[in-house]
Amino acid sequence: SNIKVITEPISDEEMVQLYHNHDVLIYPTYGEGFGFIPLQALATGMPVISTYDWAHYKNFLGPLKLKSELIDSPWPFPHEGKVFEPNYQHLLELMRDVSMNYNAYSGFYFAQSTKIHEEYNWLQLTNNAFDHIFKKFR
């Protein structure tokens, strides 16, 4: 089998290596909090097929944005409310397209990765998040 379930914590270096050992991240999710997994993959330059309607990083998904539909959650507990159901027919189309045009997608997403590193500078994000608090005590 070419599927391996990782149940133990892995180091940052192992995580980067995991991304570099694969060609495409396929992430058809109904919803996500921050979305570290696709963001990390995008930051390595990996093409990512992902649901985008809720994603704060949707501007970086480019042509591999996976269509979805806003529906009532099929899991009333503990996830009541609305979710974005991935369009699996569109997922198949995107997977086929990226497999046939991998070099073009790879170049596009590699170019996008520098923009992600600029926008998601953790020190700057932290400073922006807490700046209003720091100003009160200066």
Predicted regions and their residues:
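Short hydrophobic beta-strand element within catalytic cores of glycosyltransferases
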Residues: 47-51, 62-65
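Nucleotide-activated donor-binding/catalytic signature segment of Leloir-type glycosyltransferases, i.e.
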Residues: 1-13
